[in-house]
């Protein structure tokens, strides 16, 4: 019988864990979790997995209640920590990750058995997850990538030196909280922001330090609805913008690629609140609301509120709105 038959006969485990393991062996996944509850994965050193250092899979059911803490994961072929499926009540705390070559250093995803689903058909997904105190660096994708997660609380992490974005809240992320993080030197490929919300609603981005990323600090793209961007400091996010404009905060109704039309839409980024952020250093704009993209499966951005932000006096326009639809832009402050 194959290994799959063995898995199918397993009784789900509870109150179990892995501690103080050190391995450089190129396993597919160094640690696998299949439908186990009340788990502890702590103080392990996991190097050279061909896929993930720690994989929490939905293949045989969901995991509820778990702590992934104090692990060091280097040089893996995919995501260092992968949470795929309808898992909940997880704490991902104080891990050090470098050199992940997949989607992200930490990936939290609603993909069902690895397959993408439409955002308006999502009825389950990873939720009630805390991601705090982690240091993620040198990844080939994003440092942190969320797909269709909700009620995920991402705080006090350092996300740096990734080829793509520092963090992406993507494809139906709802009601997540991203606060007090340091997001630095991401988007090495060029033309990418430090923080991206792509098809996400009701997320809060609060009090982050976003600097030295490759194009913009914080970007809402395609459909971003009712998000709150508040109290962030965005500095010098234009070092490798590759001809694109750069702004501290960028609101874009970008077109949806043909291959993604079955999964996401390009309605536009509407009803977002951008409040009390500080934007200085190398950008073209403090806040930029882009023109419409209705001809290319995109949309228009409207009814956003841009207020009480502080912008460098070096910008020709602290806040610029090129959309055909109306937004509120007032009471912003130019710094000396």
Predicted segments, located by residue:
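Solenoid scaffold repeats with emphasis on beta-solenoid/beta-helix
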Residues: 11, 16, 29-34, 38-39, ...
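Solenoidal tandem-repeat scaffolds enriched in leucines and small polar residues
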Residues: 53-68, 74-89, 96-128
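Residues in short coils/turns that link rungs of repeat/solenoid architectures in beta-rich domains
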Residues: 25, 30, 47-48, 53, ...
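Short, small-residue-biased leader/transition segments that mark boundaries at the very start
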Residues: 1-7
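Intrinsically disordered, low-complexity Ser/Thr- and acidic-rich flexible linkers and loops
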Residues: 59-61, 110-125, 189-190, 240-244, ...
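Leucine-rich solenoid repeat scaffolds
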Residues: 296-336
